[in-house]
């Protein structure tokens, strides 16, 4: 586990990172020994190790697992059985993962001790930024955080996201460190009404514009959501600043009290300045114009977030985009030691004390090939990865996960001291993703199968399909390309708009709870679009891939297309376009139910 350190002492933090990345093997062996010694008598480990706690028996007898393999244990804990099924410490919260199991968000166990470790881990990044960016420590951060709605299991165990757990763990008595580093008071970020919270965080940021040194949000998609909100609400924000009065619709007590020390008097000069910038024809470089002393944008821009880099670059006006760390609900793992690198070059150095890390070797073309990475998986230790090879992380944690496959694909790009660093390649078998949603090929196929039933009464058939994410506007949305055929030979057909719009809705309604929550509740996913292409378009697509070396006998239409030339072929053949006109259903209980 992380040694105790002073997060305000930059020199001490950097020294700690040097030590951790130098003594990797020793730390990893110690971490595994500590985890096994603590948890050897749990029901889960007892079944494999029979009380033994050595590394050799662990690797030989404890299987590499997916969520489905351990779901029964987590369900039992959620239903009231003791935590010692999997962990010797009490499970304090079940984190809702962005990944799903059967369309339901995975529930990941977390102890209070592990949560505190993750908070400490998060504070390691600021010293790296200060080291690389001159003057950054002279101002504060305007990083937008939001809590999400929580729920409880049948026995009262909290179910919430990692960010919500982080924000709720900071009490009023120890929020002084937060308030010394962040522009927005901690209290405002804990407001359950995201709209009020976002408005007040923006208002704080505008009032303190000359004190903002960095901007951002945990993920690129959420930061763009803030920018879109600013586009819609800047006149009202300017009015509040001009009059010195907060809008009447802001009623949450945490917001009104938090904004009180900022909005103290009318400031017509500042209001006019903001109004002048926001009313210009183009919003290019708006972030740099509104916050002239900002040095960087801090947000995760790797993986599915990479699609938002062009939009962030447009709004930022040349400010560096920094991607801080790599982690998941299951485990926090890596830090970006080179924050000023190009977004396409971001790699994360694994911090060896956060868990025990193994890596499952993966074929580089596994996502395109559509088959399992290897028939006999090869699992290697952290120190034994090879540069240029692709791996799936396998984590063993202090909170009760043992040899758990995270589902990401990482590529080893080098070493910092003795700790390997990785770039993010993608998710195993994910074909579409915009924000926290992750739609797998099977999920998409089932959704399209449900929708195409609506074509049958009209003598139409779905001949083939593929998909992509359109992130040219915000929020992004799914696009599905359909090639239709008629059951009546030589018949000319014009797809009925009502039918096709219902097909769009049926696909959305058939997707998992995380997607539907993003559409209905979070509003960070736009309406799904179906584009009908000319007959023969998919033959052109096949010929394109065959020309690049694919085998005609093994060719399968890719269910998601990212290749620019392939997309040009599809777009050139589009004859009609349809958008979903209804919002799919979603209810809070779906976070931990079977729907």
Swiss-Prot record:
Tissue localization of expression is: Expressed in seedlings, roots, and parts of the siliques.
Recorded coiled-coil stretches: none
Recorded hits in Pfam families, A to Z, give:
GH3, GH3_C, GH3_M
UniProt-annotated binding residues for ATP: 97-98, 302, 325-330, 348, 408
| Highest taxon of source | Eukaryota
Cross-referenced InterPro entries, in alphabetical order? GH3, GH3_C, GH3_M
User: What task does this protein carry out?
Assistant: Indole-3-acetic acid-amido (IAA) synthetase that catalyzes the conjugation of amino acids to auxin specifically using the auxin precursor indole-3-butyric acid (IBA) and glutamine and, possibly, cysteine as substrates. Displays high catalytic activity with the auxinic phenoxyalkanoic acid herbicides 4-(2,4-dichlorophenoxy)butyric acid (2,4-DB) and to some extent 2,4-dichlorophenoxylacetic acid (2,4-D) as substrates, thus conferring resistance to herbicides.
- What protein am I looking at? Indole-3-acetic acid-amido synthetase GH3.15
The species this protein belongs to is Arabidopsis thaliana (Mouse-ear cress)
Lineage of the organism: Eukaryota, Viridiplantae, Streptophyta, Embryophyta, Tracheophyta
């Amino acid at each position: 586990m992380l040694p105790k350190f002073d997060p305000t002492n930059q020199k001490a933090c950097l020294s700690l990172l040097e030590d951790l990345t130098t003594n990797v093997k020793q730390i990893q062996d110690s971490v595994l020994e500590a985890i096994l010694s603590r948890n050897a008598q749990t029901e889960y480990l007892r079944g494999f190790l029979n009380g033994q706690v050595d590394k050799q028996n662990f690797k030989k007898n404890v299987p590499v697992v997916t969520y489905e393999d351990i779901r029964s244990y987590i369900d039992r804990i959620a239903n009231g059985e003791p935590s010692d099924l999997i962990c010797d410490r009490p499970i304090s919260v079940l984190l809702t993962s962005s990944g799903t199991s059967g369309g339901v968000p995975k529930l990941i166990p977390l102890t209070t001790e592990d949560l505190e470790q993750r908070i400490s881990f998060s504070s390691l990044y600021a010293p790296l930024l200060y080291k690389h960016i001159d003057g950054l420590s002279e101002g504060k951060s305007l990083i937008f955080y939001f809590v999400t709605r929580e729920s409880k299991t049948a026995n009262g165990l909290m179910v919430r996201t990692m960010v919500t757990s982080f924000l709720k763990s900071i009490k009023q008595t120890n929020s002084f460190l937060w308030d010394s580093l962040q522009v927005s008071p901690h209290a405002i970020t804990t407001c359950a009404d995201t709209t009020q919270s976002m408005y007040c965080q923006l208002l704080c940021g505008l009032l303190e514009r000359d004190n903002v040194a960095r901007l951002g949000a945990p993920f690129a998609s959420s930061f763009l959501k803030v920018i879109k909100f600013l586009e819609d609400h800047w006149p009202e924000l300017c009015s509040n600043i001009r009059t010195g009065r907060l809008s009447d619709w802001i009623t949450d007590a945490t917001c009104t009290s938090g904004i009180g020390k900022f909005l103290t008097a009318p400031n017509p000069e500042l209001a006019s300045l903001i109004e002048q910038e926001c009313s210009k024809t183009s919003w290019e470089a708006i972030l740099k114009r509104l916050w002239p002393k900002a040095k960087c944008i801090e947000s995760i821009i790797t993986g599915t977030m990479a699609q938002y880099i062009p939009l962030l670059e447009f709004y930022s006006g040349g400010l560096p985009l920094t991607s801080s760390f790599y982690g998941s609900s299951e485990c926090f793992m890596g830090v970006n030691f080179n924050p000023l690198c190009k977004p396409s070059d971001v790699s994360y150095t694994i911090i060896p004390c956060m868990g025990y890390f193994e890596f499952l070797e993966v074929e580089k073309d596994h996502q395109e090939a559509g088959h399992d990475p290897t028939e006999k998986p090869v699992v290697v230790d952290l120190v034994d990865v090879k540069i240029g090879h692709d791996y799936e992380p396998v984590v063993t944690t202090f909170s009760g996960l043992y040899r758990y496959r995270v589902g990401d694909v990482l590529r080893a790009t080098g070493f910092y001291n003795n700790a390997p660093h990785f770039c993010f390649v993608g998710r195993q078998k994910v074909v579409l993703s915009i924000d926290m949603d992750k739609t797998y090929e099977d999920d998409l196929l089932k959704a399209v199968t449900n929708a195409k039933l609506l074509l049958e009464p009209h003598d139409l058939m779905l001949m083939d399909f593929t998909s992509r994410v359109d992130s040219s506007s915000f929020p992004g949305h799914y696009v599905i390309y359909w090639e239709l055929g008629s059951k009546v030979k030589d018949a000319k057909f014009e797809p009925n708009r009502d039918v096709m719009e219902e097909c769009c809705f049926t696909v959305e309604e058939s997707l998992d709870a995380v997607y539907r929550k993003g559409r209905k509740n979070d509003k960070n996913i736009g309406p799904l679009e179906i584009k009908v292409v000319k007959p023969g378009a998919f033959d052109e697509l096949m010929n394109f891939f065959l020309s690049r070396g694919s085998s005609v006998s093994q060719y399968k239409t890719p269910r998601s297309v990212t290749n620019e030339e392939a997309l040009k072929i599809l777009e050139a053949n589009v004859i009609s376009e349809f958008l979903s006109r209804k919002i799919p259903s979603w209810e809070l209980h779906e976070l931990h139910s079977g729907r």
